[in-house]
């Protein structure tokens, strides 16, 4: 399994995807090295997006201890200490399009617009989150360290 993942990552190491409205997704290995917006990510705004049930919907599947958000999910992994395990570039790729790392993931692609299934006509060609929103989430998640939990 690890060999297959390694082969897939090697094949993806220079993949670039974009539409005219969105910043290019430049994937190197298991990370997206180029930010998706010129906006510098704000951890405070990222926390709000993470907890909002009308924005990123992150708390429907994930949980962070100490976060003021009731009924946090348990479908996805708990994200406490994620900043110790992944770099900001690795976090960015997992938010933007986790299916590039695991084609069986149930996590939605928040930035990819092509090759999706059953997308309502009103939302076709639109990202679920803007590049700036993703950068805010990256800033928030990257600062979640084990000693902070």
Predicted features and spans:
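Sec-dependent signal peptide recognition
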Residues: 1-9
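Gly/Gly-Pro-rich "capping" loops immediately C-terminal to redox-active cysteine motifs
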Residues: 36-40, 63-100, 106-120
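C-terminal capping alpha-helices of c-type cytochrome domains
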Residues: 112-149
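The canonical Cys-X-X-Cys-His
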Residues: 46, 54-65, 91, 107, ...
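Sequence context surrounding c-type heme c attachment/ligation sites in exported
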Residues: 44-59, 70-73, 127-132
């Amino acid at each position: 399994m690890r060999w297959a993942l390694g082969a897939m990552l090697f094949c993806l190491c220079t993949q670039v995807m974009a539409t005219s409205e969105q910043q290019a997704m430049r994937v190197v290995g298991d990370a997206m090295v180029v930010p998706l917006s010129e906006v510098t990510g704000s951890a405070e705004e990222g926390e709000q997006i993470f907890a909002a049930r009308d924005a990123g919907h992150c708390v429907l599947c994930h949980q962070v201890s100490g976060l003021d958000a009731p009924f946090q999910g348990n479908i996805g992994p708990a994200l406490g200490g994620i900043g110790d395990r992944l770099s900001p570039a690795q976090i960015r790729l997992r938010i933007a399009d986790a299916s590039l790392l695991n084609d069986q993931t149930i996590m939605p692609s928040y930035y990819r617009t092509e090759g999706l299934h059953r997308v309502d006509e009103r939302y076709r060609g639109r990202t679920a989150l803007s590049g700036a929103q993703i950068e805010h989430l990256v800033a928030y998640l990257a600062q979640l360290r084990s000693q902070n939990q």
